[in-house]
Amino acid sequence: MDEEEHLHRFGTPLPALQKDVVPAKKPVAIEDQIVKDENGKRRFHGAFTGGFSAGFWNTVGSLEGWTPQTFKSSRGERASSKAQLKPEDFMDQEDLGEFGIAPQGIRTRDEFANEDEQKQRSDQRRRKLMQPELGVGAIPGLPVLEQLLRPVRDKVAVRILKSMGWKPGQGVGPRQTRKEKRQATARNSKEQYLMEHYGAEGLPSNKENKGEEDSNNEDEDDEDITFAPDDYEPIFYTPKENRFGMSYSGLNRDPILSKSSSSSAKPMQHINLFGEMEAQANKKQLSIRGQAFGVGAFEEEDEDIYARDDMTRYDFSLADKKPKQKKQQHVQQRHVIDGFSEDNSPAVLQRPYAIDLPRDFQPRNWLQRRSRFAPMDKERAQKLETASEYKRSGLGRHDLNPDQRAQILGEQQQEEKTAEEQPKRNPFKDHSKSLMERINARTEGFTKGGVITENGEEQQTELAKEVKEANAAIQERAALKTKDLPSAMNSSSAFKPFIADEAKQLRYEKFVSSKLTDDKEITEFLARMQPVTLSLWDREMEKKEFIQAAKIYRPLVGLMNDRFVSEANVQAEKVEQQEKPPEERKIVMERTKTMWKPTALLCKRYNIAEPFGGAMLEPEKELKAKAKISVFDYLETSVNTKANFETPSIFPKHIEKSIPEKVETPPSPPPAPQPEAEIQDKPNTKEEPSKHTFVPKTPLEQAVDESRNKPISEKVDLFKSIFEDSDEEETELSEQDKLAILQESFGLPVTSTTSAAAQNVLRNTSPPRGIFASLFSPKIKDAAKEPAPTKFGPIEGSKLKIAYKPRKERLRNDRELAMAEVAPEDIYGPKLPTAPPQKPAAPEIQAEANIDDRLQQLWQQHAPKKRKAEKWVEKKCISGSEDSDASSSNESSSSDSSDDNDKRSKLSKPKKSHKGSSSKKSKKSKLKSKKKSKKSEESKHKAKKKKKKSKH
Amino acid sequence: MPEFENFNVKTTIDCKQGAVRAVRYNVDGTYCLSCGSDKKIKLWNPASGLLLKTYGGHADEVTDAAGSCDSSYIVSASLDKSIIYWDVSTGAPVRRLRSHAGGVRCVCFNEDSSIAISGGRDNAVMCWDIRTRRLDPVQVMKEARDCITTVATNENRIYAASLDGCVRTYDIRVGELTCDKIGEPITYLAQTRDEQCLVAGCQDSVVRLLDCETGGLLSEYRGHRGDDYHIECGILSNDAQIVTGSSDGDAFVYDLLDGKVLQRIRISDNGGVVHSLATHPKRQEMLFARRRDMYVFSTDLQIEEEQL
């Protein structure tokens, strides 16, 4: 019993276990715990805890099942544009909720958001843009321009400041005079110093007035020059809330690396390197972005294991407050906009500040910005109008009479006499001028800058603004005065355009009532009224103004009269117009008849026989030839054709003329017998040569002309000259030339008429190699048997018709010839090489040839006897009876493709296998054929090059 | 010669299809078509004013329409550059013919409705084979140098009036194109029943009667006002009177021979241009289009009384 009394019990005891009963209530296993949303639906699905419920229980169906979408014709609603579906339309309610994919909440607008938030958002936007379906532009991916250019947008606060006249770099506050400013800077620097050395709770600064004295004597006259205050970091004096010693802050309760330590106004403690990163991490935690994986709903968030030990990790009391707090915080945070945190400081009763607004203040939403190209709002347009009017007329200063000027200058009401005696001058101008000069003299780098006014427009100068303001003030005053005046001096004129100037207005009213129209009379009339002080120019201007004003500010009746016309008048006018007899134009009928061919089908449909039995000439043959009529046909409708600008006789042929024309149609007999169809086909080509007769023809052209009318079989020569591999003849030719040059240089007579045999002697005697080997050798052998008809065979010297020389060579030859004529003494400079040395080249070729020969010999030696039968490998050896035809035809085309060669080799393969050759041999043969094909390719390239050259 | 009887209004139909661009009778005059600026064609019974069918499918204003000889098809021209061949009974477009490079202004059938002829703003006259399913024109005549305003045809000729002031006659039988130059832009062209003459409404507020054979100018009819409107004219079935619309809301009936105004039909007191008209192929009856309305005028008093 005693013991029981001494025991202290905490909590409620568990029910005593009954002996037989095993505890039935098992804790629910984690996997069996299900999170449900407010509708009782399961919130997370999938294999892992983190998943989303998409659609209807993760299906595409509904409670009734899935039905495929039925076809709905959009025909009826073609015009109505479909409402753009947003992703939100496909989301569930919970997706839009706090924990969904697209949480919706209150956010600060971009204009007000702080910088990193803005950046984050723009990043998001960019990410969106990067998605292919959203990238609308032609260039996929990030828009480059957006990357390069970033709109300059100040924060609203900055904008407001700017509109108040603040400029970046300046401080905020009332403008200071020079003296004041100096004091301020001194004070600031001192404070700064104190701040650095003693912290925020440093000693209060003593006022030192030493510096003032020297400045005082410098200048006292420039009181009216004001400067913007300097920008400095203001010092916030925080009230002391604790009872620690001076500048002692105790142990920081926050985690060391947390953000709050850096953001709190304790300067000397800790530099947080990870501030930004941490802040971002925090944000992430705050806004659950719907990541599928991570911390489960039932799991406690892991502790920050990398955080260093600090005091927060220790309990200071037995009660475990922490989780509670956390929950509370979380609940609170839900209603806080991203990037903000709730203020925990106790609410301080703040005295409401009554702001007395300027009288002409007009609230305006700064965010409703208009396009630059949108029409101006009426008010502003008017404002501008008046302002510019003022400027345009250049009369700003003339509008002021001496009284007003006196008012502006702050002079006391002077006697009229003195006012009149004063010379006319613009007080503003002079004053301002001197002011500007003084400012310029004082300050270096003072640049005239615009001031952003309330409307966001930059006023040219402050002066203009001041003048305007002053004027407005005067006008206001004047208006006030006139208000008291007995109204209806002149009842007829409701408008008082010159109300600002009473005298002027009076004059105007008189002028209006006089109803003068003559210019002279008006001047005289006005002269009587105008004060003597008014200059001639002013008088003139006033007259003009009056006339203009009288025009504008007319009584309503007149205005209406001008705008509207009575119906009777209109009718009368119309009748008059009608009555006016329209000028009689003699209509002369003209009839022209032309041939026109209706199409056969049209005739058929009209059940009419085709005119002339369908044998009519068709003028629109080319139109018919086109399969489809394209829009471009109409680009050259009859209006645009050349024929239309000429006499109509050209336009479809006249019947009368067409008959003789027909007789004429067969043109002068063609140079060669030709089928009739060809005549009609090529009328243009025939005409052309006659047109361009003056152009000297190249031999090739001549050949083309000659052979134009020949049958194809006879055109072989032409083709040869065009397409043949001009390698051989060129080499021949060059050699011939070289010889000639050599002979010339040796002083021998040039033997131009050398026989073929003689030339052959001069030729390179080395055996043909590579592709030429295959080209030449059979030719030489078969020369006797089949003389000419090869299409692209080499041309023998005597046969040569068209010799092509590369331009370079020709030029060189010419030059050399020219040089040869001139005596060597007359020429200076290094001598040009007359001809490439032949001798060194020859052995090379020879050597190559030798190598080839030797290779062949080797090949033949090493090859087994059987292989000797395989003559197909080297073309040179082809003389076989079976292949002769094919080979000759193949060889005849000098630029045979390598493919063909390959084919041939393939074709011949079976033969070889038939003969029982080993795979080794076939390999070798393949290699050979490859080599050959390579060579042939080379030759092909060469040929191509030649062709190009010849074309040029 | 029978005496001229005045025309009286028989029916007034509010077509409810925007401005009525053209009114046309069918082949025997029992029905009529109105082409609206709302891109639809409406088939009416002119006697009762009953709307029979609406044909919609054009993409722009319908400028002209014509019924086939058996009244089972309609061909219509539109500013959407296409011609549509409609089935009358189903109201469905059978074929859409596109080759014109500009809006099509006029269309007509030949006598047995095997060929449709159209003229457009692209200065081209196109002949379309209706029998086959060919979608390109059988023949294109591009001689005109300005917009084709009317095409007409008879057994062996195709007439095309153009704003270049010429009436072009394509004689299929002879294989000849005859160009009669008047010199004034022609806004409309009508044939007399005997096919001897053409009635050409000109831009200078004159209707001219042309002789087909010689190409001579037979007569001129003045009195109405054309201004710059596309005013149509017509000839009554007895070939004795010529009708024309006017820009001042009237219609004029001229005597063919002496060119006098027989009747100035006051269609409406509210003005509006009477720009389109159609004459009944058999009776003394006419259709007029003014603004949104279609008017049926007839000399037949009895019907009028019945109506009243």
Swiss-Prot record, chain A:
One example GO MF annotation: RNA binding
Organism of this sequence: Drosophila melanogaster (Fruit fly)
Ranges of biased composition (kind: Basic and acidic residues): 107-123, 375-402, 414-432, 679-691
Pfam families: DUF1604 (PF07713), G-patch (PF01585)
Annotated Basic residues bias: 323-333, 906-934, 941-952
Gene Ontology CC, one term: precatalytic spliceosome
Ranges of compositional bias, category Low complexity: 886-896
Coiled-coil region: none
Protein name from the UniProt record: G patch domain-containing protein 1 homolog
A biological process term (GO) from this entry: mRNA splicing, via spliceosome
Ranges where the record places region Disordered: 104-127, 165-233, 320-345, 370-432, 660-711, 822-952
